[in-house]
Design a protein with these regions (language model features):
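A structural motif corresponding to the C-terminal end of an alpha-helix
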Residues: 1-4, 61-65, 102-111
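A conserved beta-strand/loop element that lines the FAD pocket in flavoprotein oxidoreductases
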Residues: 3-7, 133-134
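Active-site donor-binding loop signature of nucleotide-sugar glycosyltransferases
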Residues: 8, 25, 137
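Short amphipathic alpha-helical segments and helix-helix/interface helices
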Residues: 10, 55-59, 96-104
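Binuclear metal-dependent phosphoesterase catalytic core
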Residues: 11-16, 91, 101-106, 117-159
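Active-site-proximal loop/helix segment associated with metal-binding centers of metalloenzymes
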Residues: 15-94
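Histidine-centered divalent metal-coordination motifs
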Residues: 71, 113-120
Length: 159
């Protein structure tokens, strides 16, 4: 398969002819769990204010995208049913989700994909746009995802 590593910050790419806005970063709710076991944790896992401003500038300049890829999702799409019950949401830094909500507002896009919550789910919208949450066990066919209709489900777009 063709694998392309994205830059560590907001950027614009073209994948298979689709103008794509990449917005990495998320807060790790399991940070202390990971650190206590000697597992990897990245201190710069969330975008800095400077990187967020870069994303805002890209949005202002480009305004229209076929696809948006982010690690987490805009705040209005947070799957509350997937929140870990033993972690108080009051302790979770929501800056990235709030930032992505700000970016989504007024942004013209057809599809948005993210993976932070480790589940597979489609969020169909009345305006024809789709929000897709994926975990690393699923591979989506980009062409099928970009051309799906209101009658297609997750199984219809898997590679």
């Amino acid at each position: 398969p063709q694998i392309e590593y994205l830059s560590d910050g907001p950027a614009v790419y073209e994948f298979d002819g689709y103008k794509t806005f990449s917005l990495p970063g998320a807060y790790s709710v399991d940070k202390w769990y990971r650190l206590n076991r000697g597992w990897t944790w990245f201190e710069d896992e969330q975008l800095s204010e400077e990187e967020m401003n870069t994303g805002r500038k890209i949005k202002a300049k480009e305004q229209e995208f076929d696809l948006v890829i982010s690690h987490t999702c805009p705040i209005s799409y947070e799957p509350q049913d997937l929140f870990l019950p033993y972690i108080s949401q009051e302790t979770v830094d929501k800056r990235m989700e709030q930032y992505l909500g700000e970016i989504e507002e007024g942004l013209s896009y057809k599809r948005w994909a993210f993976g932070h919550f480790h589940a597979d789910r489609l969020y169909p919208r009345k305006d024809g746009r789709q929000m897709l949450m994926l975990f690393n066990r699923s591979v989506v066919d980009l062409q099928r995802f970009m051309h799906m209709t209101e009658y297609d489900g997750l199984q219809d777009i898997l590679a």
